[in-house]
Amino acid sequence: RCNLACKYCVGNWSARKINDFTMDELKKVIDECKGLGTVHFTIHGGEILLRNDTKEIIDYLKGNGMYVNLVTNGILLPEKIDDVVDVDSLCISLDGREENNDYNRGKGTYKAVMAAIKIAREKKLKFVVHATLTKRSIEDVEYLCEQAKEMNYYQQFSLLLKPLTARQEDQDLGLTDEEARDTMRKLIELKDKGYPIFTFYPTLRNVINWPFNLSKSRLNRDEIPANADLINCYYGKLKISIDADGFAYPCSSLNDSFDALNVKEVGVRRAFDHIIKTNNCEACYYLTQNDWSLLLGGSMNQFINQAYIQAKGVFKRS
């Protein structure tokens, strides 16, 4: 479920009518994940803060020794802040200046998210701010990075190449191939100037050097050119995505195409084994996924990069 209706939403969460996990079902999934060696758990949506048991979920995850990252649109964060103070990290969504953010995400969301950022800072929580880059928000990239520098947090980005809704009026939101690659070059320039951009250099270069038009966002094993220098994907090998309806995917970008099993029906282990055996997706240019794949693949530079970011967050809270 979600309390917003962002124009580019991949899940159409605000219109979904599925039954979410019960607390008992979630605890069973968490127990199974722990048994498989899980140490990091990201809670995302939809909007998790619509639930009344978010604190109980976080407490159960922390009690099982897991690092907990929570993704929120920020609207309910000020009133639910006491429920999330024990997470290890937060991700709050903001797409740009008020006009462009509210065009993408709904009227009034900019002011609400700025209030969420304010209270996260007051509580000394470790958080990043995430922006989806659309035709409207690419003009605000420097603004977002400047604000992150002033307010002492990291700015994260993802790319929208085409709208993921059927609404005809939203079809102009996606970036062209040229706009996307040029924006990655701009982010590299800003990182070089010291702006706190979470997205890692190799991830940004991976978009610039993508061997196909960016309308082709994912590659199966037999589609990767022999001389291509792409980031190896570890989604579906060391990391999976479980939807609110229980279906388990290699990653959320495949929820419209992968033949998934449901953890409520077959359990996490069998659903994970099915992913390992049948997933054929090997590379993409998605920013968050490739930042993760560098870490999971043992990139020493990414380990150092993340250790620095995590250490800054620890000192912020102390």
Stretch-by-stretch model annotation:
Residues 1-83, 306, 318:
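Conserved alpha-helical substructure of the radical SAM core
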Residues 1-13, 17, 31-35, 204-228, ...:
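N-terminal pre-core extensions flanking Radical SAM catalytic domains
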Residues 5, 37-38, 86, 151-154, ...:
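Short loop/turn motifs at secondary-structure junctions
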Residues 13, 45, 94, 159, ...:
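Residues that line or immediately flank small-molecule/substrate-binding pockets and catalytic motifs
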Residues 21, 64-67, 88-89, 93-95, ...:
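Radical SAM enzyme [4Fe-4S]-AdoMet core and its adjacent flexible, acidic
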Residues 78, 99-100:
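A short, histidine- and acid-enriched strand-loop-helix "catalytic/donor-clamping" loop
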Residues 227-234, 245-318:
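Flexible mid-to-C-terminal extensions adjoining Fe-S/redox cofactors in radical SAM and related proteins
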